[in-house]
Amino acid sequence: MADPKYADLPGIARNEPDVYETSDLPEDDQAEFDAELEELTSTSVEHIIVNPNAAYDKFKDKRVGTKGLDFSDRIGKTKRTGYESGEYEMLGEGLGVKETPQQKYQRLLHEVQELTTEVEKIKMTVKESATEEKLTPVVLAKQLAALKQQLVASHLEKLLGPDAAINLTDPDGALAKRLLLQLEATKNTKGAGSGGKTTSGSPPDSSLVTYELHSRPEQDKFSQAAKVAELEKRLTELEATVRCDQDAQNPLSAGLQGACLMETVELLQAKVSALDLAVLDQVEARLQSVLGKVNEIAKHKASVEDADTQSKVHQLYETIQRWSPIASTLPELVQRLVTIKQLHEQAMQFGQLLTHLDTTQQMIACSLKDNATLLTQVQTTMRENLSTVEGNFANIDERMKKLGK
């Protein structure tokens, strides 16, 4: 049984089950939650923020090369290697092969170019600070310029040939230019060789270059479709620029909302041809006749409007004339209506009282009738009881007399 001192405390729900609520986790989950919270708030854990969009853009249209890969556990003399990747993959299909001097030179140029770009970005974003650093962006830019000058001054292009001067930003264009230059050189060599007369067959020149051209029709179709889409886009922009919006107030712009540029040009040409001198005279004559009709319609409309206005004014005047005698008696009529209103209210109250009195009178009459009926019954009962009592007394007297004898 509960303690009686807690019986009348406020806020206690009666005739309801007891509910114990808490915001804490169960005991089994509290230790795990504390460990996760400590790991999230600890300064020893490095939290890396990953941008999904940047990661997608970086690895978009990239494929993993599986040539020469072996993940098996077979025993052999050669080492089984899986995927190999580095910061700079400029060897193409020759991953795992030692770099040639040309490839190393291209990689160094690429690294210097990337470092220069990053330093320029740092110089644009980082503000000058009072604290001294070991390598400030300005000093680093100077060192990069000196390194690039030293790399260019090594004259590796002369040693490695024109292949080392490939433009890394546009390798396909650079290869095409190199192909054209070597073809021109081959033509010049053939022209010089045909000018001299030789009696014996000369062996084939080993300096000639043989090229293999591989056609890619899918890429050609894709590039052609891209060019067509670009052309359609430019035509759409041109049509949107030339086309004007439909203006209901301007008759000259009616019908210029064509489906394409050719329809708009045809409509404009038809409108311009309508401005011929011979056509303008006919248009002017028709406009003069139309203007005369418009003036007549305006005059007729003005006369009709004047007649309508006069009729309305006459009706209003007659109404005012009829209202004048009524307006003089209106205050007395209002006063009388107010008085009659009070009288009507008193009469209504008197009628309600009469109705209540009549109802009360009927109730009293009914009560009197009931009381009279009850009185008659009581009198009858009293007579019967009185006669019975008298008979009983007579019997008692007779018995008393008999007992006295």
Curated annotation (Swiss-Prot):
The modification N-acetylalanine is found at residue 2. One of its GO terms (biological process) is mitotic spindle organization. The modification Phosphoserine is found at residues 85, 324. The keyword Chaperone does not apply. It is found in: Cytoplasm, Cytoskeleton; Cytoplasm, Cytoskeleton, Microtubule organizing center, Centrosome; Membrane. It comes from the Eukaryota. The keyword Acetylation applies. The lineage of its organism: Eukaryota, Metazoa, Chordata, Craniata, Vertebrata. One of its GO terms (cellular component) is dynein complex. The modification Phosphothreonine is found at residue 136. Residues 105-132 form a coiled coil. Residues 1-25, 187-207 are annotated as: Disordered. It is a peripheral membrane protein. InterPro entries: Dynamitin. Belongs to the dynactin subunit 2 family. Keywords: Acetylation, Coiled coil, Cytoplasm, Cytoskeleton, Dynein, Membrane, Microtubule, Phosphoprotein. Subunit of dynactin, a multiprotein complex part of a tripartite complex with dynein and a adapter, such as BICDL1, BICD2 or HOOK3. The dynactin complex is built around ACTR1A/ACTB filament and consists of an actin-related filament composed of a shoulder domain, a pointed end and a barbed end. Its length is defined by its flexible shoulder domain. The soulder is composed of 2 DCTN1 subunits, 4 DCTN2 and 2 DCTN3. The 4 DCNT2 (via N-terminus) bind the ACTR1A filament and act as molecular rulers to determine the length. The modification Phosphotyrosine is found at residues 6, 88. This is Dynactin subunit 2.
